[in-house]
């Protein structure tokens, strides 16, 4: 769970300090800087970015990113619509509900968090229910409105388009895509370049950690 991940992060930071790993924060590295370092190996672990699909009415002005919400960079209104019922959407919905927000979670697939392991999934769904999150599945968003969405039930191709509105905030959690701004460019002057974690393929934290450990033992 989140508590285990939090403890793991603390452990990894402590180990880095123990072995003298230089850590630089709040700095966006450039190709020029990397070239000047003349490294033998570069590991690209730049993560993923929020996926913004081509849906009418969707723009950066009327939706919030899950990461900004979870990190406290933005504050939502009382009534919140979370679009996307994957792990990030479900976790965001839970987070907001625990802050006494009135949350609705909408998902196109017939089930929520379909890729989550069978042990963690029931617990997360139970948390959503206990936190009184309204969950709407089989709902394909047709258009984003200033205060909601229109959607159609995927089980009925010719069914009516319904409106879900009256929200103060909308959080977009419809997926992530790999973010690797210069992995290919690095190969021009670095002999060994490895892309791992979400930068390779958006997934779960334990998968990224496994890739990192596996790579570290082979370099």
Model-derived features: where do they sit?
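Short glycine-enriched, charge-decorated loop/helix-capping segments at active-site entrances
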Residues: 1-3
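A Rossmann-like FAD-binding core segment of flavoenzymes
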Residues: 6-51, 58-78, 98-185
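Short, surface-exposed amphipathic charged segments that create phosphate/polyanion-binding patches used
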Residues: 84, 151, 208-211
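Glycine-rich Rossmann-fold phosphate-binding loop(s) that bind the pyrophosphate
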Residues: 84-86, 175
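N-terminal Rossmann-like FAD-binding beta1-loop-alpha1 element of flavoenzymes
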Residues: 87-99
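A conserved FAD-binding loop/helix module that cradles the flavin
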Residues: 89-92, 111-123, 181, 187-190, ...
């Amino acid at each position: 769970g989140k508590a285990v991940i939090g403890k793991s992060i603390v452990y990894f930071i402590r180990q880095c300090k123990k072995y003298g790993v230089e850590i630089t924060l709040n700095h966006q590295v450039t190709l020029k800087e990397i070239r000047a370092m003349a490294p033998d190996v570069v590991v690209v672990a730049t993560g993923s970015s929020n996926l913004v699909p081509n849906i009418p009415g969707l723009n950066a002005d009327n939706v919030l990113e899950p990461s900004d919400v979870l990190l406290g960079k933005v504050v939502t209104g009382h009534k919140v619509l979370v679009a996307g019922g994957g792990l990030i959407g479900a976790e965001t919905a839970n987070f907001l509900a625990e802050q006494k927000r009135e949350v609705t979670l909408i998902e196109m697939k017939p089930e929520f968090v379909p890729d989550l392991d069978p042990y963690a999934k029931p617990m997360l769904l139970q948390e959503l229910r206990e936190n009184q999150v309204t969950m709407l599945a089989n709902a394909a968003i047709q258009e984003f409105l200033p205060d909601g969405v229109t959607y159609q039930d995927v089980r009925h191709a010719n069914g009516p388009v319904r409106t879900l509105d009256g929200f103060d905030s909308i959080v977009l959690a419809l997926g992530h895509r790999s973010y690797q701004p210069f992995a290919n460019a690095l190969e021009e002057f670095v002999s060994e370049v490895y892309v791992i974690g979400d930068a390779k393929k958006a997934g779960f934290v334990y998968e990224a950690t496994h890739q990192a450990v596996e790579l570290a033992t082979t370099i």
